[in-house]
């Protein structure tokens, strides 16, 4: 069983962009290439899922479960952020064994809970806030509380907007001189969206510690390899090399079933058209 996650920058809906990279049909081709049994998409689409996407994924054998973010208004209710949706897909052959629920984290944003009875597995799909470490921590606390009630093996997939505190890259970004220098740069270039400051906060590592240090979860990728690039929506002239790891697959399995995880199968995919790289893991 292959389980995957990929932040696709709302590319399953059609809206005007400055560039034409990775339209909905390109994302569908990428999904076919990855060939997951279960896959989660933060920022799947805004407003409306493209009809051709529904048809194409149905032909590929998938059931689609879209869930609206319903996030508290943080000033971004325009363009690709308007009526933003999460999406979980799974193969039709698992239909009789799977139930999908919507959960609420920190009364801020929805997340998805997939329960696979046959495989004694719960898969959470989450997208933690990208603007506030405080909100990320509260969302992580809620996720820890909700998941602690489950007896099954657990995977948490998604875009955490958070790095591990032990990651050498986050250590560099937490260096006081480096941090001050980047903040000065942000002011100099009039960084109105606080992209630099927000990235620095993602390096604090405190949100992930709620789940790892306090919640007993571990990251599938202990090497902490990067998953995001600068080649983001409307800035696709920027390079595609990977910079930071904020997409994670966390796990909590019991001692007997830990052998189900094929750690060597963990994969970070090539550039498939988003600023995030898709990631996947196989279960035996």
Each language-model region and where it sits:
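N-terminal, active-site-proximal structural segment of metallo-dependent hydrolase catalytic domains
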Residues: 1-59, 69-83, 284
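Active-site beta-strand/loop signature of hydrolases that rely on acidic residues for catalysis
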Residues: 3-8, 30-50, 123, 142-169, ...
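Short catalytic/ligand-binding loop motif for oxyanion handling, primarily in non-cytosolic enzymes
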Residues: 11-14, 47-50, 73-75, 132-133, ...
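Surface-exposed cleft-lining segments at the edges of enzyme active sites
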Residues: 12-15, 125-137, 194-195
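Structured beta-strand-rich core segments of catalytic domains in phosphoester-bond hydrolases
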Residues: 44-128
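Conserved beta strand-loop-helix elements of the APE1-like EEP
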Residues: 76-97, 116, 209-214, 240-259, ...
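Short proline/glycine-enriched turn/loop segments at secondary-structure junctions
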Residues: 76-77, 235-240, 267-272
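Metal-dependent phosphoesterases centered on the DNase I-like endonuclease/exonuclease/phosphatase
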Residues: 139-246, 251-254
């Amino acid at each position: 069983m292959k389980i995957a996650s990929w932040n696709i920058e709302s590319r399953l809906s059609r809206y005007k962009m400055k560039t034409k990279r990775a339209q909905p049909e390109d994302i569908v081709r990428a999904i076919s290439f990855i060939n997951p049994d279960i896959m989660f998409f933060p920022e799947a689409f805004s407003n409306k899922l493209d009809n051709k996407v529904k048809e194409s994924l149905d032909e590929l054998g998938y059931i689609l479960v879209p869930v609206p973010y319903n996030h508290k208004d943080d000033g971004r209710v325009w363009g690709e952020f308007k009526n933003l949706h999460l999406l979980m897909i799974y193969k039709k052959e698992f239909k009789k064994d799977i139930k999908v629920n919507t959960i609420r984290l920190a009364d801020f944003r929805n997340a998805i809970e997939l329960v696979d009875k046959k495989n004694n597995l719960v898969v959470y799909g989450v997208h933690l806030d990208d603007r506030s470490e405080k909100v990320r921590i509260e969302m992580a606390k809620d996720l820890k509380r909700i998941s602690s009630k489950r007896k099954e093996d657990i995977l948490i997939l998604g875009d955490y907007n958070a790095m591990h505190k032990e990651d050498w890259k986050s250590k560099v970004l937490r260096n006081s001189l480096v941090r001050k220098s980047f903040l000065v740069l942000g002011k100099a270039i009039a960084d109105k969206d606080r992209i630099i400051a927000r990235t620095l906060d993602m390096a604090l590592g405190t949100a992930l510690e709620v789940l790892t240090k306090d919640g007993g979860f571990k990251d599938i990728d202990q090497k902490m390899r990067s998953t995001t690039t600068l080649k983001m929506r409307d800035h696709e002239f920027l390079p595609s090399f990977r910079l930071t790891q904020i997409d994670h697959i966390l796990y909590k399995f019991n001692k007997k079933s830990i052998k189900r995880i094929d750690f060597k199968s963990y994969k970070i995919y090539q550039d498939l058209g988003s600023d995030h790289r898709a990631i996947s893991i196989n279960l035996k």
